[in-house]
């Protein structure tokens, strides 16, 4: 599996090529050869490929039957918490987290998002030559932008500590990718290898930083000294409220360890998802200049040269269509998995316990039977009447998942993306650099393997 991926991704592909065979070559080969309802053995585990939207809906709606597989211990060094909890533990955690992600709370985060976006576009302006244009690999800047947004919105005034967490998480991702194959060797995690020691050391440092932030914030909240609008403050407030409403029962609320894991999840999911969405959006708009012009015209019509506001962002129809289409073509994750632990009926198939179900987001999003002959082409017009009318068969579009376990941070990611796109369009025209190489690669999330090199022109 790994060798086929490395061989396929050793060079770039054409911008108009099907990315599925490049990004996930092994699964693409299996589905092409054996069909959309095929299965393979991954060691002792039978893995069923799922591409039928009705089955996908049934699996994601019935979360008490179709469970998330127990996370690989390497992945759990990076993220845990809500992403992997099940049953009552998940329901309690989601209830405590929900208030922090409602639209009213997100609206109050807009100034922090604006500051992060402003810093990056100002930096780009200083990099552009006096002639009015320069080549820039925008990918690292967009990664910094998204990390900065999460630092500010998650930790508020403590965002410098948040930046340190981002640096550590970035290092951890690289180590996890380098050691992903070794993790299948029984007992490997207990060996005192250099990488194992380093990963555990990074995890300890991240936890120590977050624990210190939490302790300081809890102390101030209990003393009534501050009421914050960042995610950590709202999470702690919601947790205190949950404990008080339960009559201070011992098992009410969530533990400090759970709060730490949620903060780590904020970082990984928030930063990776949005930075890659912005990078692919710039690549698509640089390639399809007519859509770039339509989006810019809309942005100037709504905001002029003024600072984007919450109400205006909600009126950006063309920008929303573009982001939806980018998420269709380049979803943040290419697949989600579920597992059954008892005999289960799915459609007309009865499955034994222990089957893993792979729900292929990229393949479904690119399926010509669902989306038409232009399924692999960039055409935001398909979303002109909203997501529901973009495709004939429901549940064929799920970049953030479906059902009760849909991504809790999707609204934050969307608001951040709209703000960044609007501010970039206000200040720059951009096109692909001749040095741009197209290589959609999965490194936990789908990202441009060779960067995103653009020629930026000041407006």
Regions found by a protein language model. Name each.
Residues 289-292, 410-447:
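Cytochrome P450 heme-binding "Cys pocket" and the immediately downstream C-terminal segment
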Residues 274-286, 420:
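Short, small-residue alpha-helix embedded
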Residues 12-35, 208, 212, 306-347, ...:
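Conserved cytochrome P450 K-helix E-x-x-R motif and the immediately C-terminal K′/meander segment
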Residues 264, 269, 335, 383-417, ...:
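Cytochrome P450 heme-thiolate "Cys pocket" and heme-binding signature region
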Residues 1-88, 92, 114-123, 160, ...:
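N-terminal membrane-proximal hinge/A-helix region immediately C-terminal to the signal-anchor transmembrane segment
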Residues 237, 429, 445-459:
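C-terminal helix/juxtamembrane-tail motif
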Residues 67-74, 85, 89, 108-276, ...:
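Cytochrome P450 heme-thiolate monooxygenase catalytic core
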Residues 359-388:
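Conserved cytochrome P450 K-helix/beta-meander segment immediately N-terminal to the heme-binding cysteine loop
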């Amino acid at each position: 599996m790994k060798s086929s991926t490395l061989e396929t991704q050793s060079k770039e592909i054409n911008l108009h090529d099907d990315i599925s065979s490049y990004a996930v070559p092994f699964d693409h080969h299996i589905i092409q050869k054996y069909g959309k309802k095929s299965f393979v053995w991954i060691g002792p585990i039978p893995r069923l490929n799922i591409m039928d939207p009705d089955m996908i809906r049934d699996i994601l709606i019935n979360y008490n039957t179709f469970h998330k597989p127990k996370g690989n211990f390497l992945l759990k060094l990076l993220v845990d918490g809500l992403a992997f909890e099940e049953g009552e533990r998940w329901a309690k955690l989601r209830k405590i987290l929900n208030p922090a992600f409602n639209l009213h709370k997100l609206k109050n985060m807009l100034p922090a998002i604006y500051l992060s976006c402003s810093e990056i576009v100002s930096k780009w302006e200083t990099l552009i030559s006096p002639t009015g244009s320069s080549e820039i690999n925008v990918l690292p800047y967009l990664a910094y932008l998204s990390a900065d947004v999460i630092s500010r919105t998650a930790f508020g005034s403590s965002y410098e500590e948040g930046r340190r967490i981002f640096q550590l998480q970035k290092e951890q991702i690289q180590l996890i990718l380098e050691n992903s194959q070794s993790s299948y060797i029984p007992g490997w995690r207990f060996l005192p290898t250099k990488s194992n020691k380093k990963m555990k050391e990074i995890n300890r440092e991240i936890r120590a930083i977050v624990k210190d932030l939490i302790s300081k914030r809890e102390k101030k909240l209990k003393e009534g000294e501050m009421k914050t609008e960042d995610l950590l403050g709202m999470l702690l407030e919601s947790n205190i409220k949950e404990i008080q409403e339960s009559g201070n029962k011992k098992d009410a609320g969530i533990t400090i360890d759970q709060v730490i894991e949620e903060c780590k999840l904020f970082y990984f999911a928030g930063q990776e998802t949005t930075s890659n969405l912005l990078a692919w959006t710039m690549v698509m708009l640089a390639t399809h200049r007519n859509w770039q012009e339509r989006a810019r015209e809309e942005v100037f019509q709504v905001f002029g040269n003024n600072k984007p506001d919450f109400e205006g962002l909600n009126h950006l129809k063309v920008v929303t269509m573009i982001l939806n289409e980018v998420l269709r073509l380049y979803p943040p994750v290419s697949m989600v998995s579920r597992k059954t632990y008892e005999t289960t009926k799915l459609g007309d198939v009865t499955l034994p316990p222990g089957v893993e179900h792979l729900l292929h987001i990229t393949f479904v999003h690119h399926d010509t039977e669902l989306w038409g002959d232009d399924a692999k082409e960039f055409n935001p017009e398909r979303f002109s009447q909203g997501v529901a009318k973009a495709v004939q068969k429901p549940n064929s579009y799920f970049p953030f998942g479906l059902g009760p376990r849909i991504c809790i941070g999707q609204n934050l990611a969307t608001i951040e993306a709209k703000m960044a796109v609007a501010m970039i369009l206000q200040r720059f025209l951009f096109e692909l650099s001749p040095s741009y190489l197209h290589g959609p690669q999965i490194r936990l999330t789908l990202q441009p393997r060779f960067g995103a090199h653009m020629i930026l022109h000041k407006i």
